[in-house]
Amino acid sequence: ECNLIDVIQSSEDEVPVPYQDIPGAPYIQLPIDLQHKYKKESTLSLFKRIGKVPNIEDLFDELVTSPNVFHYRNKMEYGFSAIGYDRINKTDIDIFTLGFKRRGVWWMGDNLEKDSGLFDALVEDNISTIRKYCEATGLAPWHGPKREGFFRYFVVRKSYKTNQLLFNLVTTSLDLPQFDLNAFSKLLQDI
Protein backbone atom coordinates (compact mmCIF):
# COMPACT_ATOMS: atom_id res chain seq x y z
CA GLU A 1 0.00 0.00 0.00
CA CYS A 2 1.18 3.53 -0.70
CA ASN A 3 0.05 7.13 -0.25
CA LEU A 4 0.19 9.88 -2.86
CA ILE A 5 2.51 12.64 -1.65
CA ASP A 6 2.60 14.94 -4.65
CA VAL A 7 1.74 15.06 -8.36
CA ILE A 8 4.85 16.09 -10.27
CA GLN A 9 3.34 15.91 -13.74
CA SER A 10 -0.34 15.75 -14.66
CA SER A 11 -1.64 13.02 -16.93
CA GLU A 12 -1.84 13.82 -20.63
CA ASP A 13 -5.45 12.62 -20.40
CA GLU A 14 -6.42 15.51 -18.10
CA VAL A 15 -8.54 18.34 -19.46
CA PRO A 16 -8.93 21.81 -17.92
CA VAL A 17 -11.99 22.30 -15.72
CA PRO A 18 -13.13 25.57 -14.13
CA TYR A 19 -13.47 23.98 -10.69
CA GLN A 20 -11.32 23.87 -7.56
CA ASP A 21 -9.64 20.52 -7.10
CA ILE A 22 -10.75 18.70 -3.95
CA PRO A 23 -9.76 15.39 -2.34
CA GLY A 24 -13.19 13.85 -2.95
CA ALA A 25 -13.02 14.22 -6.73
CA PRO A 26 -9.67 12.80 -7.88
CA TYR A 27 -10.89 12.08 -11.41
CA ILE A 28 -12.73 15.34 -12.16
CA GLN A 29 -10.03 16.54 -14.58
CA LEU A 30 -10.43 13.45 -16.76
CA PRO A 31 -12.96 13.09 -19.59
CA ILE A 32 -16.15 11.48 -18.29
CA ASP A 33 -15.57 8.19 -20.14
CA LEU A 34 -12.21 7.75 -18.40
CA GLN A 35 -13.77 8.73 -15.06
CA HIS A 36 -16.33 5.96 -15.46
CA LYS A 37 -13.65 3.46 -16.48
CA TYR A 38 -11.42 4.21 -13.47
CA LYS A 39 -14.33 4.30 -11.01
CA LYS A 40 -15.59 0.94 -12.25
CA GLU A 41 -12.11 -0.62 -12.05
CA SER A 42 -11.56 0.81 -8.57
CA THR A 43 -14.93 -0.40 -7.29
CA LEU A 44 -14.50 -3.93 -8.63
CA SER A 45 -10.98 -4.05 -7.20
CA LEU A 46 -12.29 -3.07 -3.75
CA PHE A 47 -14.91 -5.82 -3.85
CA LYS A 48 -12.18 -8.33 -4.70
CA ARG A 49 -9.57 -7.11 -2.24
CA ILE A 50 -11.60 -5.99 0.76
CA GLY A 51 -14.93 -7.72 0.17
CA LYS A 52 -13.25 -11.02 -0.76
CA VAL A 53 -15.54 -11.47 -3.78
CA PRO A 54 -13.24 -13.16 -6.33
CA ASN A 55 -15.83 -13.39 -9.13
CA ILE A 56 -17.18 -9.84 -8.88
CA GLU A 57 -17.15 -9.41 -12.68
CA ASP A 58 -19.65 -12.28 -12.99
CA LEU A 59 -21.95 -10.60 -10.46
CA PHE A 60 -21.58 -7.05 -11.75
CA ASP A 61 -24.39 -5.84 -14.00
CA GLU A 62 -23.55 -2.34 -15.22
CA LEU A 63 -22.30 1.05 -14.13
CA VAL A 64 -25.25 3.41 -13.70
CA THR A 65 -24.11 6.96 -14.42
CA SER A 66 -25.59 10.27 -13.40
CA PRO A 67 -27.35 12.23 -16.15
CA ASN A 68 -25.25 15.23 -15.04
CA VAL A 69 -21.48 15.25 -15.39
CA PHE A 70 -21.13 18.15 -12.93
CA HIS A 71 -23.21 19.53 -10.06
CA TYR A 72 -24.96 16.23 -9.45
CA ARG A 73 -24.73 15.80 -5.67
CA ASN A 74 -27.73 16.61 -3.49
CA LYS A 75 -25.74 16.77 -0.24
CA MET A 76 -22.33 18.10 0.75
CA GLU A 77 -20.59 18.15 4.10
CA TYR A 78 -17.93 20.80 4.64
CA GLY A 79 -15.62 20.59 7.63
CA PHE A 80 -14.20 23.32 9.82
CA SER A 81 -10.63 23.01 11.05
CA ALA A 82 -8.12 25.09 13.00
CA ILE A 83 -5.31 23.47 11.02
CA GLY A 84 -5.24 24.28 7.33
CA TYR A 85 -3.26 23.33 4.27
CA ASP A 86 -0.98 25.87 2.63
CA ARG A 87 -1.17 24.95 -1.08
CA ILE A 88 1.85 27.09 -1.99
CA ASN A 89 4.28 25.77 0.62
CA LYS A 90 2.58 22.36 0.82
CA THR A 91 2.47 22.28 4.60
CA ASP A 92 0.04 22.68 7.47
CA ILE A 93 -0.64 26.09 8.99
CA ASP A 94 -2.74 27.41 11.86
CA ILE A 95 -5.69 28.99 10.06
CA PHE A 96 -9.50 28.97 10.20
CA THR A 97 -10.67 26.65 7.41
CA LEU A 98 -13.99 25.59 5.93
CA GLY A 99 -13.94 23.11 3.09
CA PHE A 100 -12.69 19.55 2.83
CA LYS A 101 -10.21 17.45 4.77
CA ARG A 102 -6.93 16.80 2.99
CA ARG A 103 -6.78 13.34 1.52
CA GLY A 104 -5.48 10.91 4.12
CA VAL A 105 -5.29 13.53 6.89
CA TRP A 106 -8.31 13.66 9.21
CA TRP A 107 -7.18 16.76 11.12
CA MET A 108 -6.19 19.17 8.32
CA GLY A 109 -8.68 21.30 6.39
CA ASP A 110 -8.37 22.72 2.90
CA ASN A 111 -10.43 25.85 2.24
CA LEU A 112 -12.98 25.71 -0.55
CA GLU A 113 -12.55 29.00 -2.40
CA LYS A 114 -14.82 28.32 -5.38
CA ASP A 115 -17.15 25.78 -6.98
CA SER A 116 -15.85 22.18 -6.89
CA GLY A 117 -18.15 21.05 -9.71
CA LEU A 118 -19.87 18.49 -7.49
CA PHE A 119 -22.58 20.47 -5.68
CA ASP A 120 -24.58 23.67 -6.10
CA ALA A 121 -22.31 26.32 -7.66
CA LEU A 122 -23.96 29.25 -5.86
CA VAL A 123 -23.45 27.62 -2.45
CA GLU A 124 -19.86 26.62 -3.15
CA ASP A 125 -18.92 30.01 -4.56
CA ASN A 126 -20.10 31.45 -1.22
CA ILE A 127 -18.39 29.02 1.16
CA SER A 128 -15.57 31.54 1.61
CA THR A 129 -18.15 34.19 2.62
CA ILE A 130 -19.61 31.77 5.18
CA ARG A 131 -16.11 30.96 6.45
CA LYS A 132 -15.24 34.65 6.84
CA TYR A 133 -18.49 35.28 8.72
CA CYS A 134 -17.85 32.37 11.09
CA GLU A 135 -14.24 33.44 11.65
CA ALA A 136 -15.37 37.00 12.44
CA THR A 137 -17.53 35.68 15.31
CA GLY A 138 -14.34 34.96 17.25
CA LEU A 139 -15.49 31.40 17.91
CA ALA A 140 -12.90 28.73 17.12
CA PRO A 141 -13.07 26.10 14.39
CA TRP A 142 -12.63 22.49 15.45
CA HIS A 143 -9.06 21.51 16.34
CA GLY A 144 -8.99 17.75 15.77
CA PRO A 145 -5.88 16.75 17.72
CA LYS A 146 -6.91 18.88 20.71
CA ARG A 147 -10.60 17.89 20.38
CA GLU A 148 -11.76 21.45 20.97
CA GLY A 149 -13.43 24.29 19.11
CA PHE A 150 -16.95 25.48 18.32
CA PHE A 151 -17.53 25.08 14.58
CA ARG A 152 -17.54 21.43 13.44
CA TYR A 153 -19.39 20.90 10.14
CA PHE A 154 -21.55 22.75 7.66
CA VAL A 155 -23.93 20.38 5.86
CA VAL A 156 -26.06 21.44 2.89
CA ARG A 157 -28.82 19.45 1.19
CA LYS A 158 -30.44 20.48 -2.07
CA SER A 159 -33.80 19.48 -3.48
CA TYR A 160 -33.49 19.47 -7.26
CA LYS A 161 -37.28 19.20 -7.52
CA THR A 162 -38.01 22.40 -5.56
CA ASN A 163 -34.58 24.05 -5.93
CA GLN A 164 -34.50 24.62 -2.17
CA LEU A 165 -31.58 24.29 0.24
CA LEU A 166 -31.45 22.95 3.78
CA PHE A 167 -28.51 24.11 5.90
CA ASN A 168 -27.24 22.33 9.02
CA LEU A 169 -24.49 23.95 11.08
CA VAL A 170 -22.95 21.43 13.47
CA THR A 171 -21.26 22.93 16.53
CA THR A 172 -20.24 22.04 20.03
CA SER A 173 -22.59 23.37 22.68
CA LEU A 174 -20.17 25.14 25.01
CA ASP A 175 -20.11 28.52 23.20
CA LEU A 176 -23.61 28.33 21.73
CA PRO A 177 -24.93 31.34 23.72
CA GLN A 178 -22.25 33.50 22.04
CA PHE A 179 -23.38 32.56 18.51
CA ASP A 180 -26.00 34.75 16.81
CA LEU A 181 -28.12 32.19 14.97
CA ASN A 182 -30.48 34.82 13.54
CA ALA A 183 -27.62 36.77 11.95
CA PHE A 184 -26.16 33.55 10.52
CA SER A 185 -29.58 32.58 9.12
CA LYS A 186 -29.86 35.99 7.48
CA LEU A 187 -26.44 35.53 5.87
CA LEU A 188 -27.55 32.21 4.38
CA GLN A 189 -30.86 33.65 3.15
CA ASP A 190 -29.03 36.50 1.42
CA ILE A 191 -26.79 34.14 -0.55
Regions found by a protein language model. Give the residues of each.
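Accessory RNA-recognition modules of RNA-modification enzymes
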Residues: 1-191
